[in-house]
């Protein structure tokens, strides 16, 4: 029986292992992008809630003589939003901050509609367009 040539076996094994390592590395980067996006959205929702409390809560609101639906404006300017969460504005994306009334609470929601996971085929579409909220009792 003729002995087979072993040249190139190490390079082939490295290619197989390197593909798995690079896939795991890029998956970790993707999860990191998602985590920093959600954290930035939380910071933006919290800042929007603070701005709303400073600008909207007055004697009538504290005395509950007005409806919470009168305080649903966005009190942050685009420049302030970008200063609070600059990562959200990468690649031309723009986060949205909305305030809605749920019962007797105001809910400030921050979302990033254009965000896409790099490995969406691996994670699915449930992680695209993340959103987070902050509730304020009124």
Locate predicted features:
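Alpha-helical hydrophobic helix detector
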Residues: 10-30
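Small-residue (primarily alanine) positions within well-ordered alpha-helices
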Residues: 11, 15, 45-52
């Amino acid at each position: 029986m003729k002995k087979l040539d072993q040249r190139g076996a190490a390079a082939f094994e490295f290619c197989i292992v390197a593909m798995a390592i690079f896939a795991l590395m890029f998956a970790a980067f993707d999860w990191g992008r998602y985590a920093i996006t959600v954290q930035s959205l939380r910071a933006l929702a919290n800042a929007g809630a603070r701005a709303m409390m400073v600008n909207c809560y007055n004697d009538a609101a504290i005395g509950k003589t007005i409806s919470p639906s009168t305080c649903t404006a966005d009190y942050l300017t685009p420049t302030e939003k970008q200063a609070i969460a600059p990562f959200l504005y990468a690649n031309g994306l723009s986060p949205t901050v909305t305030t809605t009334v749920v019962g007797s609470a105001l809910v400030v929601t921050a979302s990033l509609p254009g965000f896409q996971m790099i490995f969406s085929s691996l994670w699915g579409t449930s992680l695209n367009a993340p959103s987070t909220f902050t509730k304020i009792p009124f």
